[in-house]
A protein has these predicted regions:
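Alpha-helical assembly-interface signal, strongest on the long, hydrophobic N-terminal helix that forms
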Residues: 1-95
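Context-gated lysine
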Residues: 7, 50-53, 110, 211, ...
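Intrinsically disordered, low-complexity regions enriched in Pro/Ser/Thr/Gly and acidic residues
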Residues: 95-201, 205-208, 215-222
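Short, cationic low-complexity segments
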Residues: 223-230
Length: 230
């Protein structure tokens, strides 16, 4: 009996017919996780590119506005109709955001935050050239999460994470700059283990192209999308 058992064990030990199945059972879950994770990584990269494109496009549309202000013709002017159009253009630039919002059963404006601002720089120094110290002041700001009118925006390292209270050091200088901040809530398809969406934030800074400054002009029917800073 003992000899028969030993012989059976020896035969079983030499058998390799089920090795592939056992190996597959170990490897399959890992491969599945990598495949699903790869899909979300690709979606994240695409979403990042689209958020950057939204910020760039809106900033460019504002910066090239050369309609003269009725109060100061040397400046360009935008009104609530212009800025509402620029804001809503995100639906065309980033249509996947609409699908994501529908999947979350929320309005698309709750899935992405778009803020548009004009910042003017001043200095009390004269004939200082490259050594001038400039103080930024928000002239107007509007959208989903307006920048604060005060205190003055803080100078930050150029590679810093975008913040509504800071500006990159490189944009400090004479004149003004248009600032567009975009924040998107990325929801992974297969990331149900992540309790909250992953935020993607991008900010773009462009100087007005044809006018020294773009001011906000209140017209009849103004919907309050923008607040002017004192």
């Amino acid at each position: 009996m003992l000899t028969a058992i030993r012989k059976y064990i020896a035969v079983f030990g030499r058998a390799n017919g089920g090795v592939a199945i056992v190996e597959f059972a170990f490897v399959a879950p890992v491969m599945l996780v990598l495949a699903l994770g790869g899909v979300d990584v690709a979606r994240y990269v695409i979403a990042t590119e689209k958020v950057t494109k939204v910020a760039n496009t809106i900033a460019q549309m504002i910066s090239v506005n050369n309609m003269p202000s009725t109060t100061n013709p040397q400046y360009g002017a935008v009104n609530y109709i212009d800025l509402q159009f620029y804001h809503d253009s995100a639906m065309v630039i980033f249509p996947d955001m609409l699908a994501d919002a529908a999947q979350q059963n929320i309005s698309w404006t709750k899935d992405i935050s778009i803020t548009m601002s004009s910042v003017n720089f001043t200095t009390v120094q004269t004939n200082c050239g490259a050594t001038c110290t400039y103080t930024p002041a928000v002239v107007w700001t509007g959208g989903d999460n307006p920048r604060p009118c005060s205190p003055a925006l803080i100078q930050a390292v150029d590679a810093s994470i975008p913040s509504p209270t800071t500006l990159p050091a490189d944009v400090f200088g004479p004149g003004s700059v248009i600032v567009v901040d975009v924040q998107y809530n990325f929801h992974p398809f297969f990331g149900t283990y992540i309790p909250a969406p992953i935020g993607i934030a991008r900010s773009v800074y462009l100087a007005p192209r044809y006018k020294p400054q773009i001011i906000y002009q209140v017209i009849t029917g103004d919907n309050g999308i923008v607040k002017s800073c004192p």
